[in-house]
UniProtKB/Swiss-Prot annotation:
This is Probable serine/threonine protein phosphatase 2A regulatory subunit B''delta. CDD domains: PPP2R3A_B-like. InterPro entries: EF-hand-dom_pair, EF-hand_13, EF_Hand_1_Ca_BS, EF_hand_dom. The keyword Glycosyltransferase does not apply. Ca(2+) binds at D400, D402, N404, E411. PANTHER family: PHOSPHATASE 2A REGULATORY SUBUNIT-RELATED (PTHR14095), SERINE_THREONINE PROTEIN PHOSPHATASE 2A REGULATORY SUBUNIT B''DELTA-RELATED (PTHR14095:SF12). Signal peptide: none annotated. Probable regulatory subunit of type 2A protein phosphatase. PP2A consists of a common heterodimeric core enzyme, composed of a 36 kDa catalytic subunit (subunit C) and a 65 kDa constant regulatory subunit (PR65 or subunit A), that associates with a variety of regulatory subunits. Proteins that associate with the core dimer include three families of regulatory subunits B (the R2/B/PR55/B55, R3/B''/PR72/PR130/PR59 and R5/B'/B56 families) and cell signaling molecules. The gene is B''DELTA. Residues 174-209, 387-422 form the EF-hand domain. Keywords: Calcium, Metal-binding, Repeat. Residues 67-104 are annotated as: Disordered. GO terms for molecular function: calcium ion binding.
Length: 535
């Protein structure tokens, strides 16, 4: 019988299950017979038998090098099965076999292809994670140190706080009102001076230089043992903003309003950015928000009211005045009856009950049955900016009576019933719930026609109107009549949010009321003066 020459590569077959091998025993036996008939196989078997009799360990060359008697290209096994084709064949497990001999002599003589590959890959892939930040390249490091040298030149004892501001803006490139925070991070001994060497240790050797600005801001603000920001971490930068910003200079004579302004800014930051609601603002949340951009805008813009995100004084003024109007006894707390008067009794009792049940958010107020100023800030932002995701989440929790994550027909009807009753009492044309239900589903277009989930609301531009229909009568009627004033305002400032437009309207109203009050007080004083009889 003429021998058949086989391509060795054909022996490198995919792993086959035992069941399939049993069903093709004739083919396997034929293949094995053909392999045994090869001249190379005859030499291999003879060599292995002789080595086994002599007690010589089997050494196979695997992709690198191996040591031993039969290693190298002259080995019959290596010539038939080159290392590049895969791992060596495993010999039969029998007494005196090469496998037993290898166990006796140790594993050091057999190279591992996996180890070779791992070492090679380790050499090719550079380190990409640095726990304390990526070290700066030498050229960047040298450029930064040269700038530092120029700013510290002639100040052997170091820079004082006022002199350090230039370092904050030109070296650190963060907003100028971060100067005090950075200064205290470097001046750990409270000497009142920052030395050149100490600043290099903090900024360059501490790898702050290579961090992007959001990570820099996060690191500057947070406490050393924290990996998150708490509200108090923002107070130093806001105090410096109040002390240095030209648009807030007029508040320097009223420290109590400076404190209220700073608190309001912090509450607004946490409302929009701290989506977990746990009071711990993470780096990931900070990166997803727009706070750093707003900080840079506030640093560059002299008119603080143009910084609509977080820092506008006019926005603070509106929030504080709305709270003060409701807080009739001025104990800085609001109860349920106070809140029901919000926006000329626009809200239903049922939705106010849900708010005071602390369903959408736990009150920070320690007085039972009353909300504090922070709680009110969250409420008014949710009420007047219903297109934002935090607002949608706030009101969704209120309407979701059984907290199962979906709004059903019964839940929607429960809240609309009070709206319907109010319309009837005011002799207005009532809209039946069946018609409202169709309108709500047309606006939201939920994936499931049987209920509305939070993602459905987040995917619709009309979601805010859904909640207005359910529990805010004033906004519901304005939506039904398509208030032309609101339409003009939207067209005039298309980039503004609902909150921006509301705050603008309210600030104008409050300013006009204050002007009228001032004029009234002035005329009364003049009238009193005219009645005085000189002596």
């Amino acid at each position: 019988m003429e021998s058949i020459t086989l391509d060795i590569e054909l022996l490198q077959l995919p792993e086959t299950s035992p069941m399939s091998m049993k069903s093709n025993q004739d083919f396997v036996k034929k293949l094995f017979d053909q392999w045994l008939a090869l001249p190379e196989t005859n030499r291999l078997v003879t060599s292995l038998v002789n080595d086994a009799k002599a007690g010589v360990a089997l050494n196979v060359m695997c992709g690198g090098g191996s040591s031993g008697t039969n290693s190298g290209s002259n080995s019959p096994l290596a010539s038939m099965f080159p290392a590049r084709n895969g791992p060596p064949l495993s010999p039969r497990n029998s007494t005196g076999s090469p496998r037993i001999a290898r166990q006796r002599t140790g594993l050091s003589n057999l190279s591992s292809p996996l180890k070779v590959v791992s070492d090679h890959v380790k050499e090719l892939i550079p380190q990409f994670y640095f726990e304390d930040g990526r070290p700066p390249p030498n050229d960047l490091k040298e450029q930064c140190i040269a700038k530092i040298n120029s700013l510290f030149y002639g100040h052997e004892d170091g820079l004082q706080l006022q002199e350090f501001k230039l370092v904050t803006t030109e070296i650190c490139k963060v907003p100028s009102f971060f100067s005090t925070s950075i200064f205290k991070k470097v001046d750990t001994n409270n000497t009142g001076f920052v030395k050149r060497e100490d600043f290099i240790d903090y900024w360059v050797k501490g790898n702050m230089l290579t961090k992007e600005i959001t990570s820099q801001v996060f690191t500057i603000l947070k406490q050393p043992d924290h990996n998150y920001l708490v509200q108090d971490d923002f107070k130093p930068v806001l105090q410096e903003l109040l002390a240095t910003h030209p648009g807030l200079e007029f508040l320097q004579g009223t420290p109590e309003f400076q404190d209220r302004y700073a608190e309001t800014v912090i509450y607004r930051i946490y409302y929009y950015i701290n989506r977990s609601g746990n009071g711990h603002l993470t780096l990931r949340e900070l990166k997803r928000g727009n706070l750093v951009d707003a900080m840079q805008h506030a640093d560059e813009e002299e008119d603080i009211n143009k910084v609509l995100r977080y820092f506008s004084y006019e926005h603070f003024y509106v929030i504080y005045c709305k709270f003060w109007e409701l807080d009739t006894d001025h104990d800085f707390l609001i109860d349920k009856e106070n809140l029901i008067r919000y926006s000329n009794h626009a809200l239903t009792y049922r939705i106010v009950d849900r708010i005071f049940s602390q369903v959408p958010r736990k009150f920070t107020s320690k007085t039972e049955g009353k909300m504090g100023y922070e709680d009110f800030v969250y409420f008014i932002l949710a009420e007047e900016d219903k297109s934002s995701e935090p607002s949608l989440e706030y009101w969704f929790k209120c309407i979701d009576l059984d907290a199962n994550g979906v709004l059903t027909r019964n839940e929607l009807q429960f809240f609309y019933e009070e709206q319907l009753h109010r319309m009837e009492c005011m002799a207005q044309e009532a809209v039946l719930f069946e018609d409202i239900l169709c309108q709500l589903f047309d606006m939201v277009k939920p994936e499931d026609e049987g209920f509305i989930c939070l993602n459905d609301l987040k995917g619709s531009k009309l979601s805010g109107n859904v909640f207005n229909i359910l529990f805010n009568l004033n906004k519901f009627m304005a939506f039904e009549t398509r208030d032309p004033f609101l339409i003009r305002q939207e067209r005039a400032n298309p980039t503004w949010t609902e909150w921006d437009r509301f705050a603008h309207r309210e600030y104008i109203r409050l300013s006009m009321e204050e002007d009228v009050e001032d004029a009234s007080n002035g005329s009364a004083e003049a009238w009193d003066d005219s009645l005085e009889v000189p002596f």
